[in-house]
Each structure stands twice: as structure tokens, then as C-alpha cells.
């Protein structure tokens, strides 16, 4: 079979060579493209004749899937698959396997870091020092004793909950299903309305799909109060980000830490959150660490090996 990795996945060429060796040793052809492209024509060209294609979070739209005549399987070095033309994959019986779980610790740690910055004004303090300022007026609060609301208690949400508990926070959660592990940890399940209205810190950790797109609408954002810290390291389109920016500018929401937007960075200059007050914005980096990139690469190659062995793993439901 012909197998192609269409873009870099955050590890060195040496790691790619090591991970691809079991594939080529079985007689399969492996091609690696070390540059990213979002051009559908170039993606189609790179996919030509490939039985298996490996991608990360670059779009792989319907028009590319349509032209990939030999394609049987997509191994995605990412958790979400909303950047792929999944309907066309389903129509063509193309299997998609993802890399769920590779970044749980990495994302959860950034969530904690964002909460600390929002409470202790770390970025603002850095700017003050560099401009001759002092700590006067910085103040700050502790995570300990705060109520943290987790919306979506999957693997990342649960990991974040454990870290918040380690700091001494009380954790409540809204989730589609309830976990015995979470209950054993003392996490209390509440209604969405109660989580939003009673939490000092709200962390959004839902996947993006047809049901969650636009989930956190203006009326739900309004349930949070003027002191609430809102953190989104999940997916941008889950939130009405224009309403989020308005709530911040109107003083109806305390602070927002956002790693994901309605588009991938670079973000257009007129995007509402860029003009919003009391924000910490990061360029979709929550999943990136040295450790998570190595885990991700291994999973995406293991997915290919398992498929070639007739025992596919991490198969996404389409």
C-alpha cells in the first residue's frame, strides 16, 4: 500500500523515520511531506494513489476526499475530526482513526495556567515590571477555595478537574454522561445553568460536533456573572464568541482565557475577541508540548500499523 504523511506533526525527521520503519519493512511505500498546505489542489495531489493518508489539524475537505480515489483510511494526528469532510468519507467507506488522549495532560495543564494568570495577573505583571511598574494594585486570588465548573467531563475535563482539586478547589460539572470515577473524586454533577451561574471558574471541554456547535450561546453566557473566569481550550465554534466579547466589554463577565477561535490563527484584526477587555488569548497551542507531540506521532503510526494488520483501533464513528 501507499501511505503518505501530508504534513509535519511536531516531531523530528528522525522520529518519523523510526516510527515509519515497521511500515516500510513490511513492503509498504511511505511518503513524508515536511511542509504544510491548505491548498485543496495540492492536498489532492499529495493524496494521489494513496491507500492511507495521515494528517494533523490541516483541513482535509470534501473536495479532497472526493478526488482521493484510492483512499481507504485516514489516520488523524488529532482528537477532533471536524476539519475533515466526514460525510464524504462515510459515503466512500473511508475509515477515520484519531489520536484521542495524546494531549490530555498538556491541555489540562494550560487550563490551570490560564486560571492562574486570570487570578494572579501574571502577564499584566510582566508588562508592569518591563515598564518600570510595581505590584501596586495587582492583588489577586487563589484557586484554593474557588468553585470550578467543568462543562464536558471527558478525559481532558476530568484531568483538569483533578488538577483543580489538587489546588484545593471544589469541582462541579455538567456532562452528557456521569462517570463513577468522577463521583469517587467528589465531583458533583449539576445542571448546565447551575454550573454557569455558581462557578468562579468555568472550563469548557466539549468536542465540536453538530450538537455542540453554538452550544454556549448568548443566553448561556449571560448566566455567568461579572466575576466569572471563562476558559475555552476546546473548540472555538462551540461558543458565540461575539456574545462572549460583548459580555466582557459590558462588564457582565470577569475574564476570558481563549485558546481556540472560529478560525485557526492568524486571527483577522476585526475579530471581536481581539478587541475585548480582560482576555488572555493563545494561538491554539493547548495541545502542544514535547511530550504530547511524541505521544501523538506514535498513536497515528500505530493506527496505521493496526489497520494494516486488520485490527483497526481508535476508529471514529461517522
Give the label of every model feature segment.
Residues 1-50, 172:
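N-terminal glycine-/charge-rich "phosphate-binding" loop or analogous flexible N-terminal tail
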Residues 62-65, 178-272:
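Rossmann-like adenosine-cofactor binding region
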Residues 96, 227-229, 233-318:
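Rossmann-like dinucleotide-binding domain for NAD(H)/NADP(H)
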Residues 153-154:
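Glycine-rich Rossmann-fold phosphate-binding loop(s) that bind the pyrophosphate
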Residues 157-158:
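N-terminal Rossmann-fold NAD(P) dinucleotide-binding loop
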Residues 166-183:
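NAD(P)-binding Rossmann-fold cofactor-contacting core
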Amino acid at each position: 500500500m501507499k501511505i503518505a504523511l501530508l504534513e509535519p506533526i511536531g516531531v523530528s525527521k528522525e522520529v518519523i523515520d523510526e516510527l515509519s520503519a515497521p511500515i516500510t519493512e513490511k513492503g509498504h511505500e511511505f511518503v513524508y511531506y515536511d511542509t504544510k498546505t491548505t491548498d485543496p489542489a495540492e492536498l489532492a495531489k499529495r493524496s494521489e494513489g494513496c491507500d492511507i493518508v495521515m494528517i494533523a489539524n490541516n483541513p482535509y475537505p470534501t473536495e479532497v476526499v472526493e478526488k482521493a480515489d484510492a483512499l481507504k483510511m485516514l489516520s488523524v494526528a488529532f482528537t477532533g475530526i471536524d476539519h475533515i469532510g466526514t460525510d464524504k468519507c462515510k459515503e466512500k467507506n473511508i475509515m477515520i482513526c484519531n489520536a484521542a488522549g495524546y494531549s490530555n495532560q498538556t491541555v489540562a495543564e494550560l487550563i490551570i495556567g490560564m486560571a492562574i494568570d486570570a487570578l494572579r495577573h501574571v502577564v499584566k505583571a510582566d508588562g508592569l515590571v518591563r515598564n518600570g511598574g510595581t505590584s501596586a494594585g495587582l492583588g489577586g486570588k487563589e484557586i484554593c477555595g474557588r468553585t470550578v465548573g467543568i462543562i464536558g467531563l471527558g478525559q481532558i475535563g476530568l484531568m483538569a478537574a483533578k488538577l483543580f482539586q489538587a489546588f484545593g478547589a471544589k469541582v462541579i460539572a455538567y456532562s452528557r454522561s456521569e462517570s463513577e470515577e468522577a463521583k469517587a473524586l467528589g465531583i458533583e454533577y449539576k445542571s448546565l445553568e447551575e454550573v454557569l451561574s455558581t462557578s468562579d471558574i468555568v472550563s469548557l471541554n466539549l468536542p465540536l460536533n453538530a450538537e455542540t456547535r453554538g452550544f454556549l450561546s448568548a443566553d448561556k453566557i449571560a448566566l455567568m456573572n461579572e466575576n466569572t473566569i471563562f476558559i475555552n481550550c476546546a473548540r472555538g465554534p462551540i461558543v458565540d464568541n461575539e456574545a462572549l466579547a460583548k459580555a466582557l466589554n459590558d462588564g457582565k463577565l470577569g475574564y476570558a482565557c481563549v485558546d481556540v477561535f472560529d478560525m485557526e490563527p492568524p486571527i483577522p484584526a476585526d475579530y471581536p475577541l481581539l478587541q475585548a477587555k480582560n482576555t488572555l488569548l493563545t494561538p491554539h497551542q493547548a495541545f502542544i508540548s514535547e511530550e504530547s507531540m511524541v505521544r501523538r506521532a506514535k498513536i497515528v503510526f500505530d493506527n496505521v500499523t493496526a489497520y494494516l494488520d486488520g485490527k483497526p483501533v481508535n476508529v471514529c464513528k461517522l
